Amino acid sequence: MTGNEFRFFLSCDISVPVTFRVERLEGNLPLPKSPDLENNAPTDNRTTELFVECALYIDGAPFGLPMRTRLESLGPSYCWNELITLTTKYRDLTAQSQLTFTVWDLSHGEGLIGGATILLFNNKKQLKTGKQKLRLWAGKEADGTFPTSTPGKVPRHERGELERLEKLVNKYERGQIQRVDWLDRLTFKTMERIKERESLKNGSSHMYLVVDFCSFEHRVVFQESGANFLFPSPIASTNDIVVVWDPEVGKINPSEHKQLKLARSLTRGVIDRDLKPSSNERKSIQRILKYPPTRTLSGDERQLLWKFRFSLMSEKRALTKFLRCVEWSDVQEAKQALELMGKWEMIDVCDALELLSPVFESEEVRAYAVSVLERADDEELQCYLLQLVQALRFERSAKSRLSHFLIQCALRNIELASFLRWYVAVELYDPAYAKRFYCTYEILEENMMKIAAGVNGEEDGFKQWQSLVRQTELTAQLCSITREVSNVRGNTQKKIEKLRQLLSGLLSELTYFDEPIRSPLAPGVLITGIVPSESSIFKSALHPLRLTFRAANGGTCKIIFKKGDDIRQDQLVVQMVSLMDRLLKLENLDLHLTPYKVLATGQDEGMLEFIPSRSLAQILSENRSIISYLQKFHPDDHGPFGITATCLETFIKSCAGYSVITYILGIGDRHLDNLLLRNDGGLFHVDFGFILGRDPKPFPPPMKLCKEMVEAMGGAESQYYTRFKSYCCEAYHILRKSSNLILNLFYLMAGSNIPDIASDPEKGILKLQEKFRLDLDDEASIHFFQDLINESVSALFPQMVETIHRWAQYWR
């Protein structure tokens, strides 16, 4: 490249994600004051745990979810050296795009160290590259508005020799300065001495965050996507259409913006009170109210709802849509919206869950949502408890109205207390939110300890809490047992012998507990010990334990304990199966589902309820058909296919229920080993490692309906198969009516660490939304689902995959 050439890339042509590296923190942290020390003398032996929260702002508005580095506690030179990749691509940036960096400390007080903001493009509209040294504003969270109140750029009059040298280093790294090895080594040594001298001169009054922006072969110059600077000159002699670039395309129209502000002004409120929508406007409003919660409203739709806000106050479905129309940065508009919210028709619990999503940041709106949840009974709350705990991530503080509500519910119901404690305890492994969840855990413990003994012989709070703590002690011992049996060389039988040997010898205290323990899976059941002779190990790579516990009421309960497997995804899926079972039964449709209990007790451990059953693969290998197997347990010479009508009906209904549910949730990796059958004919699914459309197998059918299941119904031409299709369509129709509830629950899980959601929350929720086919009316959706069933039955490729899977199981 000659001196007169300037080669560059256009930002609109770069389709790679925005990437940068958070390197280190320079300078001394402000020392916390300790009330235990005289004159608040500083303490040097403190352990500080820092992480950096990074967020992208475009034109002063947040864009995408913030990203966080890992915790770093190897101070005082805090070095993360962590690569951060945003979902936004360079082509999507504007000239006023900014990155905000906020440093948090999880070990002291509120934990805010400081923040800084940096523009991604300089004043020449060139993308900044290389190392950037940002000054942190102590005690301030990074401000992403434009212009920002926390600029990371050091003022010109304070820049020393080091600033000039750092710019030269950036040029050196881009290859713009010739490399001379022996001279470079001397130069860098000299620079280190200058750096030490500058640090001593500046003292410890400032902190700096060093970040390294991605570098390209050439400079990157900003250009809006879609802009075309190269257009042909309009020549009179040509008949071609001339394309002219309009620089104002896509920008805010000042006239329209002014009209919008006037339309929403307070003086319009007097007129708007008496406005009634016309016939066409009413149809448009009804169409908007049917939108799923994931759909973004257009400007015209927002304006329409705002215009008729007073006439919509009697329509409870309209509140969540109306609150999405509010410009919350406008103080007067926000105030008016909150006043209307208080007078609005009370919304349903389903809509209240939507108001707890990250879209709604107003504390008043979130408090209103909690007030609606207070009307729900404990049984309904338990259906949503997992998501309500996840919603704590989106609160502004640890001591929020939602946190207080969950704790109050737990204090009056020991089962809710047990599940709340476990859900919160699992989130303590998330470094970004550990402090918040630990605060909730502490408040729950503190309040439960204060409960006095009941007049009906109920335990006091201390004993109740201790019974929950013993659950953790039990799981710790089960983890130890799992490690012991995994280390045993040999086949599964030798591992089973080792398990029973441990329970009868070294860990014999587990066979009879000193005091009964509440079952983690069913806190209403007290367990008193493990029965060694009835305990076993599954033939699997992780060697899950199958344990039989004695119950205080004289019976037994069987559980599966897994170590080394993240079952939080299974927990979510089974929770949704349980919820859908409840929704179907409310419409008088019992499909004999088996929503067995699942509880994650850690990031890689958990418990599952054991349901006596056999896999279809095992049944078909021993009995050749499902009907032959069921004839052993429910023979009836006068019944259909030689079995009782009740047994066949249970099989047909359960097949229909799980066919619909696994389709909606996009359950993948289905094979005959994770389809189980109870002796009464009830079929159910296990192992949900792939959800929301993910599947390791090529060409998966829309739903898992193998030919053996259809043959058990008498074939595709039988009346029983027709009944099966009828149940499927009825169940699909019922669940479509509750699509908003299901979508809201998944939306609240967007911040969780569940693998198939965390990888791309937005894509996963859109996949779920697609399965409901909300673009179709009821009749069209029934025809769609009937075609879907026919497509799944005719799928041949999955049958080949089943054969391959059986070969793999043989060699395990």
From Swiss-Prot:
GO terms for cellular component: cytoplasm; endosome; membrane; peroxisome; phagophore assembly site; phosphatidylinositol 3-kinase complex, class III, type I; phosphatidylinositol 3-kinase complex, class III, type II. Residues 14-175 form the C2 PI3K-type domain. One of its GO terms (molecular function) is 1-phosphatidylinositol-3-kinase activity. The keyword Transferase applies. InterPro entries: ARM-type_fold, C2_domain_sf, Kinase-like_dom_sf, MHC_I/II-like_Ag-recog, PI3/4_kinase_cat_dom, PI3/4_kinase_cat_sf, PI3/4_kinase_CS, PI3K-type_C2_dom. Keywords: ATP-binding, Kinase, Nucleotide-binding, Transferase. Pfam families: PI3_PI4_kinase (PF00454), PI3K_C2 (PF00792), PI3Ka (PF00613). Its EC number is 2.7.1.137. Belongs to the PI3/PI4-kinase family. This is Phosphatidylinositol 3-kinase, nodule isoform.
